[in-house]
Amino acid sequence: MSKPKIYIDGQAGTTGLQIVQRLSQRDDIDLLMLADEDRHNEQARKQMMDQADLIFLCLPDAAAVEAAGWIGPDKKVIDTSTAHRTKWTYGFSELDPALKEEIKTTARLANPGCHASGAISMIYPLAKAGLLKEDALLPIFSLTGYSGGGKKMIADYENAKEEEMNSPALYALGLGHKHIPEITKICGLKKAPVFIPIVDDYRQGMLTSLQLDQDSFVKPVSKDEILKVYQLAYQDAALVEVHTDSPAKLYSNTKAGKDSLEIFVNGNDDQFIISARFDNLGKGACGAALQNMNLMLGLDEKEGLIL
């Protein structure tokens, strides 16, 4: 049986480069590579797409939309941009068994955003269980390493001379972050969350927190009841761990270099903080993309992942 042929369009970007490095170490796929001088050659890119069984689009949104239009329906595509996240099959298999089966058969998959992965991992189980009020205010803070901003932000931080770049920075304060639409749609929310991302002076790792109180729920709940919702939701998830004992302090870079995600539940009788910790380049990008590729190709979903 021949190995599946994989082509990465956008192999020099942050996510594309990570995928290239990871797939180069595997012997169960055939990685198709363009010479550096051909990376912007449209004809050469199309020829690679024609040869491939599965194509990763690791491009800016507009370029991803254009490239997707070149690809025939018989080819499998994983788009890592935001362009198709509210339109194509959403690549978060742990959310629902039916979604996992859809991922296995789809030809068009949108890889989740990094911040969105954390937010959705926390909101979706509560919404699915019918516990959240339709008009609940959902404040979310999400702390990321600077690699989440791509090559330019990486260069800015690693060559920084300004002292202020040594401290955390809130951004997207206009409340229009590009991950909000997918969070809202995938979780079935009628009101968009109040989402504040924060970038800090470390390379990779992400910690996303959701703040809730009793007014967020349709009925009174306890911390243990909330914990049980997550335990049930992720009981068969190989890449999601729900902690029964949550520490009072969480570091955001603990999962750097890993492809799994952790859920923590903290709080008291009235207020709760749910946290998701993972690597923005792992379960938040490359790791999720490889997991989805494995599922779409009929392979073990954990193949080549770092847990």
Regions picked out by a protein language model, each given a short descriptive name:
Residues 10, 14, 114-121, 174-181, ...:
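Conserved active-site and cofactor/substrate-binding residues in soluble primary-metabolism enzymes
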Residues 211-307:
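C-terminal active-site/capping subdomain that shapes the small-molecule cofactor and substrate pocket
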Residues 204-208:
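Conserved glycine-rich beta-strand-loop-beta hairpin in the small C-terminal domain of fold type I
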